[in-house]
Design a protein with these regions (language model features):
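ATP-dependent carboxylate/acyl-activation modules
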Residues: 1-209
Length: 209
């Protein structure tokens, strides 16, 4: 908690605090994220509350630490990439944060994509009016989204055998640009790891017989 409080004081309030754990891809589902913390004491209380929530879920969850970020205003979007077994690498874009699964407002393209493809993806989601200043909301910098999509496509195309899945969720977008708030990457097993796993599987089947 002391380190989180110190970093928060250096960043400036308000801040966001979230748990860092390889076992928790969706931290907000268990109370692993606290927003709009106005002081060091609030950070300390949030830190203790997050730890309690994580331990209540399971004592086996690995906690690597905590992440302190400046509280920013904007619209949450998701950028992702995965490998379809039939079509290969696919890039995904849509409304992000907690609304991804609830609204299912996403579009996808096969990788690699052009900048024009990225522009089309941004325009095609049902929530596109939110990005254009809908009902008094500030118009966001859509060029920053297009750039992020293009760079993600380039990254996945460069390492198709190493990246199994990559999610940037949420990425916060406002009039000034875009900031990746949280991200998760799953790496493909190396050939040696796959062979070792296959040998273990064959051995366990043999022992079972």
């Amino acid at each position: 908690a002391r380190d989180a409080m110190r970093v928060a004081g250096q960043i400036g309030f308000p801040v966001v605090l979230q748990v860092v754990s390889p076992d928790l891809p969706h931290k907000s589902d268990i109370g692993g994220v606290r927003l709009d913390l106005p002081s060091k004491s609030a950070v300390r209380n949030a830190y203790n509350s997050i730890l309690k929530a994580v331990r209540a879920r399971s004592s086996r969850i690995s906690i690597a630490g905590s992440l302190v970020q400046q509280q920013l205003e904007g619209i949450e979007v998701i950028l992702g990439a995965t490998t379809d077994p039939q079509f290969g690498p696919v890039i995904v874009f849509g409304l992000g944060g907690i609304y991804v699964e609830a609204l299912n407002d996403t579009v996808c393209r096969l990788i690699p994509i052009t900048r024009q493809d990225a522009q089309s993806m941004v325009a095609e989601i049902k929530s596109a009016p939110l990005l254009n200043g809908f009902r008094g909301l500030a118009r966001v910098d859509k060029r920053s989204i297009v750039t992020a999509l293009s760079r993600l496509s380039t990254l996945v195309a460069r390492f198709p055998d190493q990246l199994q899945e990559l999610d940037i969720n949420p990425m916060l977008v406002n009039a000034q640009g875009a900031v990746a708030v949280d991200a998760m990457a799953l790496l493909t097993r190396s050939p040696s790891e796959r062979k070792a796993r296959d040998r273990r599987n064959r051995k366990s089947r043999h022992v079972g017989h």
